Amino acid sequence: MSERNYLEIMHQYCKDVQTGVRIAGKFEKLAVKRFLNDLKRQENDHDFPYSFSEERMNHVCSFIENLHHWKGALARKHFILDPWQVFVVGNIFGWEDEDGIRRFTDAYVEISKKNGKSALAAGIGLYMLCGDGEAGAEVYAAAANYDQA
C-alpha cells in the first residue's frame, strides 16, 4: 500500500470545512480553526508548549491503514481513512510536548450511524494497545446495550 500525504489531507479537509465544500457543524468548524491557529502558534509563540509531529501522525495513520476490514463487502481490504478520520487521528496523535507526551489524552467524537466510527475506534484502540509504546496498555470498549455491543 502506498504512503499517502496525511498532512496534505488534513490541510485540504480544513480548507473544505472553511470554504463550505464540506458541510460542518459549529464544533467541527471550531476544531479546524483551533488546529490551524495552533499550527501558527507553534511557529510564532515560544510559550506554546506543543508542536505538531507529522512523523507521529503518519505512523498512526499508516498503522490504521495497514489493518483490514474483517467482514462485509470490504472484507480483507485495507482500511482507507476518510479525510475527517485523518483530521481526528492527526489531532489526537500529532500534537506533543517537548518530551513527546501527547497533548490530547481524551477525545470526544460524535459521528452518525454508518460513517466509519467502529472501524476508526478499532484502529485507534489497536494502535493504543500495541503501537503507542505504553507498557501494560489496556483498551476497553463499552456499549449501551447488548445489541449495540
Q: Where are the predicted features?
A:
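Phosphate/NTP-binding elements of NTP-utilizing enzymes
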Residues: 2-149
